[in-house]
């Protein structure tokens, strides 16, 4: 008799409205392929905590901004950690999964990140700029983002927001990794249309930059996306390290790279199930 196949609860908000893209198409593709190797069911993020006990692992994919279901996500996270539920990506991520504090920490440590502070007494640490970006610490997808002048900052920097100089970057670029292996890079040639991505061939220095943050985060398993911008001096600055539910923009890849990613994803899931003990 054949061994039972691993049971995967795949978490996705198929109806999430995203500007310029359809998140659901990506998860329809991935689940259709993963079913060849796993017994798989999809669920909405609000239902994950109630359903996860019947599965060998939970895979969190395009589940939308946690801000929209904070209580349910916190309950899922607390229960999964308490029970030892296998969650992919593992819940030990130090970047977006844990909030935006890492941007403050990395900035204070002098790493190549857009300079970031959250309090009025630290505004002197920001470089001079014509405009500044203010966004909620718990925000996502540019929700609540404001562009303001320096004179407005003291009244806004109260610890609940992040403050950064507005960088006139040449373009944004994203580097996708599965576990610690680089998969592909995409960039938006037109900063005004940042959701329109095309393949990007990274240099050795680009990959060294991206891998520095992957190594810092320390996740042995999972999908991570390093988002950066090309600063006026030609260097890269980290915008965010998405380690919770990064959108992958697979539709922007050619068939060979897309197939390579699907293969790497499935192999990573098998390693995860083999390496991480079940509860």
Language-model segments: residues:
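A conserved helix-loop-beta module that forms one wall/lid of the active-site cleft
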Residues: 74-147
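Short amphipathic alpha-helix with an adjacent loop that forms part of the alpha/beta core around
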Residues: 47-54, 78, 123-128, 152-155
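Flexible loop residues that form catalytic
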Residues: 13, 63, 121, 137, ...
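Phosphate-binding site of ATP-dependent enzymes
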Residues: 141-237
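A short beta-strand motif that forms the metal-chelation/ATP-contact edge
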Residues: 55-60, 135, 175-177, 184, ...
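ATP-binding N-terminal substructure of ATP-dependent carboxylate-amine bond-forming enzymes
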Residues: 1-86, 274
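Short amphipathic alpha-helical segments and helix-helix/interface helices
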Residues: 27-31, 73-78, 103, 123-124, ...
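C-terminal active-site "lid" helix and adjoining low-complexity regulatory extension at the edge
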Residues: 230-279
């Amino acid at each position: 008799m054949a061994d039972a196949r691993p049971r995967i609860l795949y978490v996705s908000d198929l109806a999430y409205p995203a500007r310029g893209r359809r998140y659901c198409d990506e998860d329809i593709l991935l689940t259709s392929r993963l079913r060849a190797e796993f017994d798989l069911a999809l669920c909405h993020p609000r239902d994950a905590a109630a359903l996860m006990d019947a599965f060998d692992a939970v895979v969190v994919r395009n589940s939308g901004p946690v801000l929209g279901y904070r209580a349910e996500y916190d309950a899922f996270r607390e229960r999964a950690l308490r029970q030892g539920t296998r969650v992919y990506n593992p819940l030990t991520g130090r970047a977006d999964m844990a909030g935006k504090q890492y941007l403050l920490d990395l900035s204070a440590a002098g790493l190549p990140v857009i300079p970031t502070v959250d309090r009025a007494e630290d505004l002197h640490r920001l470089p001079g700029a014509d405009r500044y970006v203010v966004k909620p610490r718990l925000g996502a997808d540019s929700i609540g983002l404001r562009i303001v002048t320096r004179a407005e900052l003291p009244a806004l920097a109260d610890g609940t927001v992040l403050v950064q100089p507005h960088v006139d970057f040449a373009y944004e670029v994203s580097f996708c990794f599965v576990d610690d292996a680089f998969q592909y890079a995409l960039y938006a040639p037109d900063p005004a249309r940042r959701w329109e991505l095309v393949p990007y061939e990274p240099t050795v220095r680009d990959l060294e930059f991206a891998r520095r943050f992957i190594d810092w985060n320390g996740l042995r398993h999972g999908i991570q996306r390093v988002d950066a911008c090309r600063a006026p001096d030609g260097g890269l600055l980290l915008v965010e390290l998405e380690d919770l539910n990064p959108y992958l923009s697979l539709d922007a890849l050619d068939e060979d790279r897309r197939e390579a990613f699907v293969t790497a994803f499935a192999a990573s899931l098998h390693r995860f199930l083999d390496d991480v003990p079940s509860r």
